[in-house]
Amino acid sequence: MVINSFISSISKEEKKGSVEFQVFCFTDKIRKLTSHLELHKKDFLSQRGMRKILGKRQRMLAYLSNKNKVRYKKLIGQLNIREPKTR
């Protein structure tokens, strides 16, 4: 799986406080919650938690895109997530 190789490479190179590692952890949580919510459609507390995590990930990605576009594009490609819509 691509994600397992990604986490092994990021844990060796980067520290757990780095933006990339935090975005990876948020993405992992979002994927787990998405599969949970497919089974439990009326679990509103999990929906709220997922919206909070999505907001945190969006803010982290916005920070990274402002600081370093190359690292941002690389991370988006590795995690297979879409770029957020711009206003």
Curated annotation (Swiss-Prot):
Primary residence: plastid
Key word Ribonucleoprotein present: yes
GO cellular component annotations of the record: chloroplast; ribonucleoprotein complex; ribosome
Localization per Swiss-Prot or TrEMBL: Plastid, Chloroplast
One biological process term in Gene Ontology: translation
Domain of life: Eukaryota
GO molecular function ontology, one term from the record: structural constituent of ribosome
Keyword vocabulary terms for this entry: Chloroplast, Plastid, Ribonucleoprotein, Ribosomal protein
Family: Belongs to the universal ribosomal protein uS15 family.
HAMAP family with a match to the protein in the record: Ribosomal_uS15_B
Assembly notes: Part of the 30S ribosomal subunit.
Protein name according to UniProt: Small ribosomal subunit protein uS15c
Organism in which the protein naturally occurs: Amborella trichopoda
Name of encoding gene: rps15
